[in-house]
């Protein structure tokens, strides 16, 4: 055997060995192997992962929105209760210097005109134009039987204490801002006319009864005339017992 044939045979053996090894390796990595199929089945696809992330974000946003709405409603209720309590406290609290303040500023409506505004007893069946179910001053609902004062022109109704307190410092309706100056001037003008009519001087007749003074009563006694008799008549004032002294002198 020559030296040239040895390398060729060795090279052929090496090629056969490598070819068998590669084919055996390919058989081990068969694409139809159960383990390989299971690995492909378990691996999640990118589309499914994206959909899961999107649904999770939507649920989180909805949860945050619902929690925010609940917190806003609770905060609104707390603020409303606090304002209602503070308003009722201010109404029930006496104002010591109210007369002096009104005298100096003269902003509110006089009590004489305020008392002429109509007062009604509230009932849910009432159907008055402009009358609501809530007092906008104290933010509390009207209860059946409560006394409400109605303002002229706009016919808006409020609690008597609330609107009296308001109109002591303002001249307008707290809801529609309707000015009440003309109405008050008309009411006060009618009052002034009524006062002038009642203030006219009247004639007063005074009858004084004075007791009568005692008067003198004259009693004359006539006796038959005799020659020797002289009749003397004396006039004396009336005594308390009504006795009359008659003196007859016989000469």
Curated annotation (Swiss-Prot):
Keyword Kinase on entry: no
Zinc finger (RING-type): 135-177
SUPFAM superfamilies the UniProt entry points to: RING/U-box (SSF57850)
Transmembrane segments: 59-79
Alphabetical GO biological process terms: protein ubiquitination
Reactions accelerated catalytically: S-ubiquitinyl-[E2 ubiquitin-conjugating enzyme]-L-cysteine + [acceptor protein]-L-lysine = [E2 ubiquitin-conjugating enzyme]-L-cysteine + N(6)-ubiquitinyl-[acceptor protein]-L-lysine
GO molecular function: transferase activity; zinc ion binding
Main localisation: membrane
Entry-linked InterPro entries: ATL10/ATL72-79-like, Znf_RING, Znf_RING/FYVE/PHD
Subcellular location: Membrane
Keyword terms of this UniProt record: Membrane, Metal-binding, Transferase, Transmembrane, Transmembrane helix, Ubl conjugation pathway, Zinc, Zinc-finger
Topology versus the membrane: Single-pass membrane protein
GO CC annotation terms, alphabetical: membrane
Broad enzyme group: transferase
EC number, UniProt record: 2.3.2.27
Pathway: Protein modification; protein ubiquitination
Entry's family note: Belongs to the RING-type zinc finger family. ATL subfamily.
Entry remark concerning the domains of this protein: The RING-type zinc finger domain mediates binding to an E2 ubiquitin-conjugating enzyme.
Stored PANTHER family: E3 UBIQUITIN-PROTEIN LIGASE ATL76-RELATED (PTHR46905:SF10), RING-H2 FINGER PROTEIN ATL78 (PTHR46905)
Protein name: RING-H2 finger protein ATL10
Species assigned in the record: Arabidopsis thaliana
């Amino acid at each position: 055997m020559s030296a040239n044939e040895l390398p060729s045979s060795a090279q052929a053996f090496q090629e056969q060995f490598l070819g068998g090894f590669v084919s055996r390796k390919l058989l081990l990595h068969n694409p139809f192997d159960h383990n390989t199929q299971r690995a492909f089945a378990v691996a999640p696809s990118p589309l499914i992962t994206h959909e899961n992330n999107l649904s999770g974000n939507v649920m989180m946003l909805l949860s945050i929105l619902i929690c925010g709405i609940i917190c806003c409603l609770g905060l609104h209720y707390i603020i409303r209760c606090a304002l209602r309590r503070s308003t009722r406290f201010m109404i029930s609290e006496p104002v010591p210097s109210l007369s002096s303040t009104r005298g100096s500023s003269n902003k509110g409506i006089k009590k004489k005109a305020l008392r002429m505004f109509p007062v009604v007893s509230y009932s849910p069946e009432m159907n008055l134009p402009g009358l609501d179910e809530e007092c906008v001053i104290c933010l509390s609902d009207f209860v059946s039987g409560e006394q409400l004062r109605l303002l002229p022109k706009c016919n808006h109704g409020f609690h008597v204490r609330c609107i009296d307190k308001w109109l002591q410092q303002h001249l307008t309706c707290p809801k529609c801002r309707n000015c009440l100056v003309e109405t008050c001037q008309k009411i006060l003008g009618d009052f002034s006319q009524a006062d002038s009519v009642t203030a006219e001087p009247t004639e007063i007749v005074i009858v004084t009864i004075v007791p009568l003074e005692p008067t003198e009563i004259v009693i004359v006694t006539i006796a038959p005339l005799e020659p020797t008799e002289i009749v003397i008549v004396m006039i004396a004032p009336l005594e308390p017992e009504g006795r009359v002294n008659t003196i007859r002198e016989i000469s």
